[in-house]
């Protein structure tokens, strides 16, 4: 397959202009028809207010065709296959000559045309299992992104997985979360962290990754999301996102598919113990978080998809002697700007409709700490994402339209064992300490503060131009009392640095 990179057009171009650009890049004759699909689309705003769309497209076929009118009245002049009816395409395939990739490359003389392989991810278990024994059914703990995809792949292989999720189904979970955001009591088993779809369901559904993908896993994930309800544009848009509102539909559809294939998804069911005999798993102990009843299920294979915040499960696994390794992380706060401000910085008043802009900023302090933006939510909301009593954590989310008044992003600082101490779970205890500080500073609500007051180490008394867009109760507090001197000084230094990239950022 051929891929044509760096096709650059004004952002408000027509489909016909893209067709023509592909035709020109390949140097096709007027009687040659090319079939292509968009592989990637990104925005080039380096020359704002002139904004460009930059494409990579995959060429599937190029044919020589008679210069006759098609049934729709158009001419055979290199337009993509979508312009040709299925019956007419079949006629062309049978009657006309396909042009080889080598000939196209040779005559195009275009360094942006390369040969690529269409890599498709293959699940290791390809043989459909029949009549699998009950004790051989794999058990999946957690129904966030990892658990959902594990269960789906296992179900498609005929292995009839059993999924235990400590939180609620998405419909019940949304009700529980809304009650909490409106001032109700936190449900420590079903909240923004726990429940069907995992934490990502209440975090916009950003699908960014910087890892290499030699086996095609990333596109397999994107294809799967589209199959269950996501917009097809996530297959090619740079920095794709789904939106919290659409994710709720997708996770339900995936669950129903798993059940339809013979799997089970059991909610309100927390892993409390794992029994191991001679180095082999023999049972899982599951507690119903609503009734308190406990079951012991015999099993041989367990997939732990427990996410970031199941801290009680981490400790249970450590007590049972499972090998664990600490992972570096970063901590910080959420920063809100008017989305119009971020848009203007990105597009400088471009005269056509553009997506809500995002940003990415990084900085290294004089002391060597890294400070950077993370999980940026255009047109989004800050949400109370707490999962333990007496602690406060926040996250960011956007709906599919990304049409909220404010943009928000985490501004976070790298931390090391010098900050939180040695021990495989020392970082977990450090997180808990910070969340307790936040809870105390906000008197049980989310503490908020103007950046100017944060710099001066004082509590704000009113809002300026930016009014918070927050899901959950909030009150004025001082973030210096939450993160401590070292981390706050790093953020303050970085904010001044960010202002050089985005004027007015701080």
What name fits each language-model region?
Residues 54-56:
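N-terminal membrane-anchoring/stem segments of glycan-assembly enzymes
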Residues 2-50, 59-69, 73, 77-506:
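Residues forming the flavin
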